[in-house]
Regions:
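Membrane-water interface segments at transmembrane-helix boundaries in multipass membrane proteins
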Residues: 133-141, 145-200
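Residue-level signal for discrete positions within transmembrane alpha-helices
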Residues: 12, 93, 97, 133-136, ...
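Hydrophobic alpha-helical segments of integral membrane proteins
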Residues: 9, 46, 50, 60-76, ...
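Hydrophobic alpha-helical transmembrane segments of membrane transport/permease proteins
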Residues: 15-65, 154-180
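An internal, D/E-rich "acidic patch" concept
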Residues: 57-113
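Alpha-helical transmembrane segments of integral membrane proteins
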Residues: 2-3, 94-127, 143, 175-325
Length: 325
């Protein structure tokens, strides 16, 4: 276990180094950040003086070394627009994004498992064919188009749900969230469905394929021959083994969904980190852009490590000790 953790920590450091290098390298290709700091009336000489003061004219290696030194102390720079530490700005918006990810994850879990299991148990039924056709269509539709269609149907035409914003929030034990109000939950529905549409078809197919593989195994056939109840075979034995790879993929996709929130949050004007990232690009707020990329990369690294560790604990056949079996 210790060897595994050390190995994963070393891999995580390498990945974060590469991510930070790429994130920092793209800063020079995003435009001039001074456009948000000074007005049009400022002379070129004053602009150059400000660039020197901010260190924008320094060589790349000098700027990157300075950035890494500050990052190791938890400082990823100060946002040009908000005039606050970039990490604080991201953390302020993170709660809204996590609400969206939780809502989408809830929908995915509640739909993919029963639909995938049913499709595996009844592979030739009409409903299974309908589910598979729907998942094929769902994979091919981009998330922004799904979001626009949902908004048009349920907000504009039917008027059932709000079309944009986070809605009313309430504070509970220091946690400011829309989960605690009906208005906040109503605002969460459409963005959550749109975000879930990215992963839901994939998870339905994943659960179905894993369940089919388990159902074709020898111990399932032996259980049927022994006369065990089919429900016990399907839901007590087969489903448990089906969930192992689903857990692995699902954990990794949590980090993916945080990154995928950019388009969903933009369409619904959801005040999360994805919407913040696009605004930072438009404003050429390079410290905030770099901090966001590194933050999302960190989420990927942490979730992958946790999933690998949990999978090794749940499935004893997986070797995480670094020793031979």
């Amino acid at each position: 276990m210790f060897t595994f953790l050390v190995k994963r920590l070393f891999q995580a450091l390498i990945v974060m180094f590469v991510i930070s290098l790429v994130a920092f390298a793209i800063q020079d290709n995003l435009g001039d950040p001074l456009r948000e700091l000074v007005g049009q009336s400022v002379s070129e000489a004053e602009r150059q003086a400000l660039r020197d003061e901010l260190g924008l004219n320094d060589p790349f290696i000098t700027k990157y070394t300075r950035f890494v030194g500050a990052a190791l102390q938890g400082d990823l720079g100060t946002s040009y627009f908000f005039k606050r530490p970039a990490v604080d700005v991201i953390l302020d918006k993170l709660v809204a994004t996590l609400e969206l990810v939780f809502g989408a994850s809830f929908i995915i879990v509640c739909l993919s498992i029963p639909l995938g299991v049913y499709s595996a148990i009844h592979p030739k039924s009409f409903f299974t064919k309908l589910v598979m056709a729907g998942s094929s269509i769902g994979i091919s539709i981009p998330v922004f188009l799904t979001a626009i269609m949902l908004m048009y149907v349920f907000s504009i035409e039917l008027g059932w749900l709000p079309s944009y914003g986070r809605g009313e929030t309430a504070n509970w034990l220091g946690w400011e969230s829309g989960f605690f109000t009906l208005d906040g939950l109503a605002h969460l529905v459409l963005p959550s469905i749109a975000l879930a549409s990215i992963m839901l078809p994939l998870f339905i197919r994943l659960v179905r394929s894993e369940m089919l593989e388990v159902l074709s195994s020898e111990y399932i056939k032996f259980g049927k021959a022994k006369g065990l109840a089919l429900n016990k075979i399907y839901y007590q034995h087969a489903l448990k083994n089906t969930m192992l790879p689903v857990l692995t993929v699902g954990g990794v996709q949590i980090g993916t969904m945080v990154a995928y929130t950019i388009l969903t949050e933009t369409v619904f004007q959801w005040p999360g980190t994805g919407f913040l990232f696009l605004e930072a690009i438009n404003r050429v707020d390079t410290p905030l852009i770099t901090a966001y990329v590194i933050f999302v990369g960190l989420i990927f690294v942490v979730t992958n490590t946790i999933v690998d560790l949990l999978y090794g604990i749940i499935n004893p056949t997986v070797n995480i000790t670094g020793k031979g079996a």
